[in-house]
């Protein structure tokens, strides 16, 4: 065989190479001549056949990869609950009734994942990220190669959970002033009732309040910036929905088209962020005392670029990486916080007794209109109110969403192979009559009263992660920004309660939350609120 290869391939190649040596051709030029000679000698139609076979192979590979990214394979020994629905709501209810205390495979029209009962909460939360990853779950279900969801760097997460959280008490009064300015711009100070589309109004308020801390007030009030941040999750959601609706075989070819608005939006955010971050880089490198530069400060914006640079190695801290981190920061901190505030304002409108209780607490805690420069644990009733809103209106059906990276065997169910998507039934926790008396009822004092009991002083906080508080996740992969989100919500709600009244138009009630294919809930975007200034 070797002699045949030598005679038919190697020797002709050497002859041609020696013949062309005087021309001093490069290897690339010589390769092109050889390839052209080979293809010219092929029978007519061979190229078409080869191209068709190559295309078929490419499509087959892409189809397999696409299917692996959107669905978990059926697992022997695991029951399957399948419906041709666009959401998981009824599927999970059925599985909960058919297989109590057992895992099952939930399959809807777009996705599939293994749903575990609440009894497995602690087992799953203890799994390390290299075994079962939350980021990989969201990256997979949101086509992360295009949306960039789930690509947060470890340095970004460290900066949020440690440095940003530590800076919050010093910034309470500054954030109050920023909050006041945002409400004045978005809502105004009119004594007459005025109608607002509540979801987008809260979205805009949270976008601007958060941006004041991260990118400074100038960019935070720039309409192009505000619009781009608000549209970032919208464009990603639309791209995911459109690509989910495409047949598996064409998804790889449609991805660029469906995510084109999202890609354009990231370009816009990059263009606006670049000059701000270049200035941050200069200030950080010019600072002689880096510890003093990173010290929590009351004025100006949070030195978040400095936080990031203190965690990155110098070679990693490029402008491109910082821009990516800031886009992730804006995406992760805005829509979920806005959704909680939306539901909190709705509950204020529906439950006027809660309004009076919360205003009374604010009068007791605030001094000259200022909140204490702490993590705001003093607002116990506010904390209970927000957690009750979160319990009744969670982000979605599931908690502890994970993508299995290494084989996993829990106390119940079969061995889960790598690539499996799994989650815990969080809705069963929030609606459990064993945990919460009258779970369908809104009770502003539910968690306030629980904390009054001896030994519960440090439990049942809004930001608590535990098996009875599924909203933030738990363990080492819990939401790193939950303390910042709670701080934002308490400051915003305190300002609203002291300065505004709210009603929901009767024709918008009851509010209708829409389940999405991924298992998350979409707040009612039809809700119209009537708001007026109190003074």
Swiss-Prot record:
Subcellular compartments: Membrane
Enzyme class, broadest EC rank: oxidoreductase
Main location as per UniProt: membrane
Glycosylation, residue list: 139, 222
Keyword Membrane: yes
Annotated GO CC locations: membrane
Superkingdom: Eukaryota
Pathway participation: Mycotoxin biosynthesis
Similarity-based family: Belongs to the cytochrome P450 family.
Protein name (Swiss-Prot/TrEMBL): Pyrichalasin C-18 hydroxylase
Organism: Pyricularia grisea
